[in-house]
């Protein structure tokens, strides 16, 4: 709120990797999301729910999860950006989309200073779409909670994946190895 009052315009960047500025192109304050942290909220023998800060690098988070055998996000391992940007676009690749693993998204409403929590059913997820691509430009995503499995079930529906592994390797595939394969493709 204070930044908005001071500068009038705010531009929120995640990593900023797809953004180029000319010196005179934006009159306002550029805010980069840099919060970090991964917290276990729930865990049982089958699943884990993680609260992940929006400023975490997406790829690093996915690799971390795969190394711990927290499964589901493997096919999204090669996507660049941050955790907070992932629900905005409902990122997806190789037969997976992030919406299938999101429990909730927590955001800061810059117009009134409120923290809001949106459960997956309220995020309006669709193909490369969410509520944040529509009318909710005043909301800054702060945290995303993911529900991941502890048993790995590979998603091998894309031919590029099948062509990258042998039948024998497919039988012994791990989440971590799947991340490597996706990154190599």
Model-derived features with residue positions:
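Anion-binding (especially nucleotide phosphate/pyrophosphate-binding) glycine-rich loop
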Residues: 1-101, 109-111
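Phosphate/pyrophosphate- and phosphate-bearing ligand-binding catalytic cores of soluble enzymes
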Residues: 19, 115-185
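Hydrophobic side chains in beta-strands
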Residues: 33, 107, 146-148
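Generic preference for hydrophobic/aromatic residues in regular secondary structure cores
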Residues: 38-39, 102, 141, 158
């Amino acid at each position: 709120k204070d930044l908005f009052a001071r500068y009038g315009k705010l531009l929120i960047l995640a990593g900023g990797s797809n953004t180029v500025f000319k010196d005179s192109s934006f009159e306002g304050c550029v805010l980069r999301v840099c919060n970090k942290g991964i917290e276990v909220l729930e865990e049982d023998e089958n699943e884990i729910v993680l609260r992940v800060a929006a400023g975490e690098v997406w790829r690093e988070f996915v690799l971390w999860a795969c190394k711990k055998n927290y499964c589901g996000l493997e096919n999204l391992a090669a996507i660049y950006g941050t955790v907070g940007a992932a629900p905005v676009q409902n990122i997806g690749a190789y037969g997976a989309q992030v919406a299938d693993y999101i429990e909730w998204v927590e955001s800061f409403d810059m117009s009134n200073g409120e923290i809001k929590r949106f459960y997956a059913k309220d995020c309006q997820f669709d193909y490369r779409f969410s509520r944040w691509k529509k009318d909710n430009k005043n909301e800054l995503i702060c945290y995303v909670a993911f529900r991941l499995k502890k048993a790995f079930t590979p998603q091998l529906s894309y031919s590029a994946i099948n062509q990258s592994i042998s039948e024998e390797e497919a039988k012994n595939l791990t989440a971590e190895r799947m991340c490597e394969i996706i990154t190599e493709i």
